[in-house]
């Protein structure tokens, strides 16, 4: 278990991990990925809260700095998946052509637009959540939800896209019991994410639903999941969860 956890942190962050204590990304590391999400969520929440202290509750800078911190510590791994997946989905061609577009090193207009929307939406939502609560648990929950979405995307019956090494390593690797357990943990944590107990669960379920729809569409479009698809699902789920929660706390 510790080896899988170290592998998950090595994959999902820039934190140094002993080479002998980690292995290749696979089933165990994917199962442990939500733990990385908890750590990243705590970091984002702390930065967003610090931003409200320094710049005031009405400033969006705290949320923007929280997103910047996440991008730095994850080396932009998942946001790159957003860009590549958006470009692939915007390609009018057969699956092999769409996969080739995703593997291309350049970023097209769809990718640029998707990244801008995701970064700005997360930044503004994180700022709103940090301003509305003494402790911005909602920020941490949204980031955590994104990594739970990755586990759901790797559940049994979900295939890997042709040519994707990461997809081949993790697609179909997560039993339903593991996915259900992480969703249960997420829902439990989300109960304290908003002023009312139902705010958090509604927000994260909406986020997970959007992530699942994206994954399903990508499976049809690309023939399966890849590392880029997982990154896009993570970021979409986190973004929708944060935006939905920011809206619900005002109800």
Curated annotation (Swiss-Prot):
Catalytic EC class: transferase
Cofactor requirements of the protein: Mg(2+)
Functional note: Joins adenosylcobinamide-GDP and alpha-ribazole to generate adenosylcobalamin (Ado-cobalamin). Also synthesizes adenosylcobalamin 5'-phosphate from adenosylcobinamide-GDP and alpha-ribazole 5'-phosphate.
Subcellular location as annotated: Cell membrane
Gene expressing this chain: cobS
Pathway given in the UniProt record: Cofactor biosynthesis; adenosylcobalamin biosynthesis; adenosylcobalamin from cob(II)yrinate a,c-diamide: step 7/7
Membrane-traversing stretches: 35-55, 59-79, 110-130, 134-154, 175-195, 199-219, 229-249
Alphabetized UniProt keyword annotations: Cell membrane, Cobalamin biosynthesis, Magnesium, Membrane, Transferase, Transmembrane, Transmembrane helix
GO cellular component terms attached to this protein's record: plasma membrane
Family: Belongs to the CobS family.
Disulfide bonds: none
Gene Ontology MF annotations: adenosylcobinamide-GDP ribazoletransferase activity; cobalamin 5'-phosphate synthase activity
Enzyme Commission number, as recorded: 2.7.8.26
Gene Ontology terms describing biological process: cobalamin biosynthetic process
Membrane topology reported for the UniProt record: Multi-pass membrane protein
UniProt xrefs under InterPro entries: CobS (IPR003805)
HAMAP family reported in the protein's UniProt record: CobS
Catalysed conversion reaction: alpha-ribazole + adenosylcob(III)inamide-GDP = adenosylcob(III)alamin + GMP + H(+); alpha-ribazole 5'-phosphate + adenosylcob(III)inamide-GDP = adenosylcob(III)alamin 5'-phosphate + GMP + H(+)
Pfam families cross-referenced by the UniProt entry: CobS
Stated name of the protein: Adenosylcobinamide-GDP ribazoletransferase
């Amino acid at each position: 278990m510790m080896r899988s956890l170290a592998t998950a942190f090595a994959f999902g962050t820039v934190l140094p991990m002993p080479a002998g204590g980690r292995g290749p990304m696979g089933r165990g590391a994917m199962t442990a990925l939500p733990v990385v999400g908890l750590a990243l969520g705590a970091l984002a929440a702390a930065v967003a809260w610090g931003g409200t202290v320094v710049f005031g509750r009405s400033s969006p800078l705290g949320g923007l700095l929280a997103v910047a911190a996440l991008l730095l510590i994850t080396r932009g791994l998942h946001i790159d998946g957003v860009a590549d997946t958006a470009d692939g989905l915007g390609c009018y061609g057969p699956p092999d052509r769409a996969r080739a577009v995703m593997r291309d090193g350049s970023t097209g207009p769809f990718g640029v637009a998707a990244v801008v929307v995701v970064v700005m939406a997360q930044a503004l939502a994180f700022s709103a959540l940090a301003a509305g609560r003494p402790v911005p648990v909602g920020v941490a929950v949204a980031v955590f939800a994104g990594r739970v979405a990755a586990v759901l995307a790797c559940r049994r019956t979900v295939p890997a896209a042709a040519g994707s090494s990461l997809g081949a390593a993790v697609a179909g690797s997560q039993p339903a019991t593991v996915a259900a357990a992480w969703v249960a943990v997420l829902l439990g944590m989300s109960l304290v994410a908003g002023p009312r107990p139902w705010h958090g669960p509604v927000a994260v379920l909406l986020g997970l639903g959007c992530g699942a729809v994206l994954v399903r569409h990508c499976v049809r479009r690309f023939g399966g999941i890849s590392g880029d698809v997982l990154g896009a699902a993570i970021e979409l789920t986190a973004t929708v969860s944060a935006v939905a929660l920011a809206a619900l706390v005002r109800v």
